[in-house]
């Protein structure tokens, strides 16, 4: 099972309206993080090459904080397809799928939710949505280019958004990759002290 599938299974398990089991939630996230770190140092499956694996010393995270596990309002608003800018010349087709409106620690936030049109054709990812975001921790505690959240097409207007699952794009680990550039509209003016930090032992590209 790959990283995205693990992520989806945990998000689905900790559903919005079910009973919240904090210990199971904590254990599941810790297991996910261990699997992610193990995959990065396994040369047979790592996104890193051998030289980068030697340089890599670990994945760092903010402490788990349920204040960043929030209820948000999802507003579906499908836009026209467009070419998403990336860190290279590659420009994959995306479209805006909707908006998330929420509050964290008394501060209002809004993020655009995107759909990758190539992944939409894959039956395993036809419900996959993508949220690139930046916040006030970038270039200090987190990767300067922002972080990502994965999301599934919801069937309700009230949805669970958990920033403890925020993860780095591949470009945070290696400049060899092509990563979507976080749109300026998805820059949060407040810090999000949850999810992945800058990778340990790797230059912040």
Annotated model-derived regions:
Residues 1-23:
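Bacterial Sec-dependent N-terminal signal peptides
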Residues 71-73, 103-105, 112-114, 134, ...:
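A structural detector for beta-sheet-dominated domains
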Residues 78-144:
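Mid-length scaffold segments of soluble, non-membrane domains
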Residues 117-120, 145-147, 177, 204:
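Exposed acidic/polar residues on beta-strands and adjacent loops within beta-sheet cores, strongest
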Residues 118-126, 151-159, 200:
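Short, surface-exposed linear segments at secondary-structure transitions and domain or protein termini
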Residues 23-26, 167-205:
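Extended, aromatic/histidine-rich regions of cofactor-dependent oxidoreductases associated
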Residues 20-79:
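Start-of-domain marker
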Residues 130-167:
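Acidic, glycine-rich flexible loop segments
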